[in-house]
Amino acid sequence: MRADSGAQGSAAQDIMINPLDSYNIRVVTPTSCDKYPGRYTSPYSAHRKHHARNVARKLGASSGLIFLSGQPTINLRDSDQSRPFRQRRYFYYLSGVDEPDCSLTYDIEQDLLSLYVPDFDLHRAIWMGPTLSREDAQDRYDVDHVRYHASLKYELQAWLDERKQGSELYLIHDSEKPEHLPKDLPLNLEQLRPAMDTARGVKDEYEIRMIRQANKVSGLAHRRILESIQSMSNESQIEGSFLNTCISHGARNQAYQIIAASGPNAAVLHYDRNNETLNKKPLVCLDAGAEWNCYASDVTRTFPLTGEWPSDYVRDIYKLVERMQDECIRLIRKGTRYLSLHNLAHDIAIEGLLALGVFKNGTIHELRQSGVSKVFFPHGLGHHVGLEVHDVSERSIMAIQRSDELQYRPILNSTCLPPCTLSAPLLEEGMVVTVEPGLYFSPLAMANARHQPYARYIDFDVAEKYVHIGGVRIEDDILVTATGYENLTTAPKGEEMLAIIRGSA
């Protein structure tokens, strides 16, 4: 049942919208739930509408209206089946609503956060179950007002009629502009996204709790695979086991495609075919992380199938990557430039590969400046984690002096993500970042390296002896705290990991 767009005025508005209330189907559950911090409840009452207010502060605006659309229901092309639903993260950040076809407004001056839910549709309710009602939404989400979608255009018009001179409508994308707006309405499409990116870079207590829970479930799933890996014969079984554990513990969604790469497949950074035999493979690199209430975890473990290192080659590369991670994590604290940790990881990799004979003919400084270490460590040390597995954050063009750029440029590439970039600000308390060093022996990368100026630093005969390994990566999610750091990742690694595989833990 939809409102007739021909009616006008507040009286007509009430007539059209209020009857929708009579169709509510309300489900009452006996369990309590945390309300998402659109505004905080006790004991955080001093931080009401924390996220919305924080974004307004980053905007530097005392008035204006923020409008955000959630993910609409969309069918697959040439099909009557809908696409798997995934909520838009900017919308979720201000609302906590993980339901399709919703939208919100935040009136900065009035400090009013309003949620708009789908109009009741009897046919849809019969076939798919009821959509979110106003009462359920008001109970579940900590917003000031809940309205049906039919009232949105009237609410927007009311704001337009009363808005102050200079007040703007803030949008992320021009394509999300609400219908029925005057063509001459001043839209601000430039400031909202940077403001929200900056706000999202530092997590509050609720967000940290969600990321910690996502890591807890991921840790259980990784542990279950270690316990049963000796009975598995194909990468697909690893993927299936991980999904089964996550779903059975309440985490239906993965933060990203599972990477279950055995042997040489582990040299492909985002390998996700997950369909090859494990037979005679020295290692499995499992990069998999569950999502909890839209918040991601990002966890990688690399392990031998028997719980014993099959050769010195395999053990030496694992131990080198383990050292890279341990030394970088130990230095995380607020005020640290993350890029310096990336630099340290490359220095440790270069030192280790020199000792193993993969590198030759140069000092650590010479090899770093040549860029040769990117052949075997081609990605950034880490990135932010939050509502996205590669989460957003502030970008400050003043973060690094031009004179310091030369020492970092050779070991950076276009795939490096904040905070592992020249423009990233220093680490702050509340940031969650990954530390994920890796060493890979990709035949393609090594073939290309033969034609580069830094080829003289590589002993290709020695490097070829490691190709069967594929690659080793170890990745944890690290919270920056007031006094240092907390490792949120609970998946076993190192000697504990090996003992679990052997059944001796």
Curated annotation (Swiss-Prot):
Give the matching PROSITE patterns.
PROLINE_PEPTIDASE
Task: Give cofactor(s), names only.
Answer: Mn(2+)
Specify which residues bind Mn(2+) 2 according to the UniProt entry for this protein. Answer: 287, 298, 475
The entry's Mn(2+) 1-binding residues are 298, 436, 475
Which PANTHER family does this entry report, sorted A to Z?
XAA-PRO AMINOPEPTIDASE 3, XAA-PRO AMINOPEPTIDASE AN0832-RELATED
How and how many cofactors are bound, per the record note? Answer: Binds 2 manganese ions per subunit.
* Entry's family note: Belongs to the peptidase M24B family.
Q: Which Pfam families match?
A: AMP_N (PF05195), Peptidase_M24 (PF00557)
UniProt organism field: Penicillium rubens (strain ATCC 28089 / DSM 1075 / NRRL 1951 / Wisconsin 54-1255)
Spell out the protein name for this chain.
Probable Xaa-Pro aminopeptidase Pc16g13390
* Known EC number: 3.4.11.9
Function noted in UniProt: Catalyzes the removal of a penultimate prolyl residue from the N-termini of peptides.
Q: Which UniProt keywords apply?
A: Aminopeptidase, Hydrolase, Manganese, Metal-binding, Metalloprotease, Protease
Q: What EC class does the entry list?
A: hydrolase
Known catalytic reactions: Release of any N-terminal amino acid, including proline, that is linked to proline, even from a dipeptide or tripeptide
Gene Ontology annotations of biological process type: proteolysis
| GO molecular function ontology, one term from the record | manganese ion binding
Q: Which residues form the signal peptide?
A: none
